[in-house]
Amino acid sequence: ITCCTRGTCAQHC
């Protein structure tokens, strides 16, 4: 999952 490019998930990536 590439959550690092989306919203709040990017904060902990």
Curated annotation (Swiss-Prot):
Expressed by the venom duct. It is found in: Secreted. Its main location: secreted. Coiled coil: none annotated. Keywords: Acetylcholine receptor inhibiting toxin, Disulfide bond, Ion channel impairing toxin, Neurotoxin, Postsynaptic neurotoxin, Secreted, Toxin. The keyword Disulfide bond applies. GO terms for molecular function: acetylcholine receptor inhibitor activity; ion channel regulator activity; toxin activity. Disulfide bonds join 3-9, 4-13. GO terms for cellular component: extracellular region; host cell postsynaptic membrane. The keyword Secreted applies. Alpha-conotoxins act on postsynaptic membranes, they bind to the nicotinic acetylcholine receptors (nAChR) and thus inhibit them. Belongs to the conotoxin A superfamily. The cysteine framework is I (CC-C-C). Alpha4/3 pattern. This is Alpha-conotoxin-like Br1.4.
